[in-house]
Amino acid sequence: MITLIIFSFLSFLLGIILSFTAYKFRSQEDPIVEIVNELLPQSQCAQCGYSGCYPYAKAIVENSEKINKCIPGGTDLISAISSVLSIEVPEKNLIITHKKQKNNTVLINESNCVGCSKCASFCPVDAIVGAPNFIHTVLQEFCTGCNICLLHCPTNCIEIKKETYEE
């Protein structure tokens, strides 16, 4: 019984020490970065030139990065970010940072698809549907053309047909 009391007291004491340490050494992030990050679509598609939505939000706030690089967010996102940051909406609606898809069609070759579901599990916007061990298909209206599914397909049955243009 005394062992239980000692361990309870030590656990309580360590909890207080950890709480104080976490409070004292917490990260001092800018709350505006969090607000901008919440506005972004969280598709982590990297079409803006950054590895994900949070690094792009941080660059917008801290480095004055252009706010019109998020392709999936579109013009509504540009308006929302400009109102949060109290800046003007840029004249050019969207900036395409790399060679990107204007009209893309993602096709899954059904004869090669083994139904492993890897493409669907890695799709950041859930544009690929299908059940394990069955053929999968792409919902074109949700697909952002990020090519992540292409990288994870073990049978190379995903094909992206696209028209491209440069900025």
Swiss-Prot record:
Binds 3 [4Fe-4S] clusters. The keyword Signal does not apply. [4Fe-4S] cluster 1 binds at residues 45, 48, 53, 70. Its EC number is 7.-.-.-. Residues 28-87 form the 4Fe-4S domain. Part of a membrane-bound complex that couples electron transfer with translocation of ions across the membrane. NCBIfam families: rnfB. This is Ion-translocating oxidoreductase complex subunit B. The gene is rnfB.
